[in-house]
Amino acid sequence: MRIHHWVLIAGLLVIGTGCNTKAPSPQAPALLMPATIKDIMDSMVEPSGDYVFESVQEISDEHGITEKAPKTNAEWEGVRRHLFVLVEAPNLLTMQGRKAARPEDRSRNPLVENEPEEVQKLLDADRPSLIRRARRLQDAAVLALKAVDAKDKDALFHAIDGIDKACENCHLHYWYPNDQRAREAAKEDGITDY
């Protein structure tokens, strides 16, 4: 009788274990990537960059020099929110498979701007360069974020200059490499790695 009990218990354990195994879950579908680099730049980076650039300024006019900087917690928080876009946008811009622009997109000024196909060739030819340039934007935005957290308008002003240089460096390489005026201005500002 005891042997029958042990056989019955062992059989139930085997059956129970077999029922407990899960079938392998199907692979999750790939995330959609409908946005192009141009879409991300137009809808996220440019508006956030404009907000940040306009947050700290020295305005010189007939009344003298006026400094503009965040003063209230809400103003600092507004700058902070837009900086997070600039910190995270490089991750989106450099995603493998992200296209430069839509097939129907065209350059507004083809004498100085690359067409989307030309930008795509540059991206495809040297992906590490894109990642390096995007990282410069990210690093500069992180510095600006630290300045905002410290509510240090002077450090923010300095960090914004770094953001501007990171943007211009990338644009001179991919978007408007034939713009001689922009190249000369970049050299005067110390931007030489484009």
What residue ranges belong to the model's regions?
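Bacterial N-terminal signal peptides that target proteins for export
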Residues: M1-L8
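C-terminal motif of bacterial Sec signal peptides marking the signal peptidase cleavage site
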Residues: I15-G18
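Sequence context surrounding c-type heme c attachment/ligation sites in exported
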Residues: N20-R80, F84-V87, N91-Y194
